[in-house]
Amino acid sequence: YNDDDVFRYERPDELTDPRSGVICIPNNYRYPNGEQMPEGQLRVTCLANYEKWGALDENTYRSQKEICRKAMLDVALGYLPNGKSMAKELEERTELLDIFSPRTIKKFTSHLDGALYGSPRKSRDGSTQFSNLYLAGSDQGYVGIVGAMLGGVAVANNRILRGD
């Protein structure tokens, strides 16, 4: 989603920029025989500033995560059918919150500047140090889910169609 006149894919000046992001409902599928997942999931991701998050003391960090969560959810719910009108019910029925920042990602994955996707070293052609092993996805430097798909297409085109 993008809630601004222009999409700015850049590091925000603030901790986060909730004006644009990705909404993911990962278990929103039709299952066989009418089965359903016992709970729903909603993920919202937006651009964030690693340096700003990294500079916060622990108490401020925790309070800012909650402030940013509320701001992100407020914008994202506006893009879902009846989202704004269901905000209170969603809050009441929430069983688990997992809020993370670039600081969290850096701590657990060592990704450069807490980046969410891909390897810190991009390989445009997908090559690795092993013959016949190629990375295809966000490791080509494209962004997000569509970027991962484009990365796969680019590597497949280079390796299979062109025979590089």
Where is each model-derived feature located?
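Mid-domain catalytic core of redox enzymes
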Residues: Y1-E35
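Short, glycine-/Ser/Thr-/acidic-enriched flexible segments
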Residues: D4, N27-R30, L47-E51, Q140-G141
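Flavin-binding catalytic cores
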Residues: T16, Q36, T60-F100
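Short glycine/proline-enriched loop/turn "hinge" motifs that connect secondary-structure elements
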Residues: Y31-E39, R124-Q129
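Glycine-rich, aromatic-lined ligand/substrate-binding cores of catalytic
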Residues: G34-K70
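A glycine-rich dinucleotide-binding beta-alpha-beta segment and adjacent secondary-structure elements
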Residues: L80-Y142
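A conserved FAD-binding loop/helix module that cradles the flavin
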Residues: F130, A136-G163
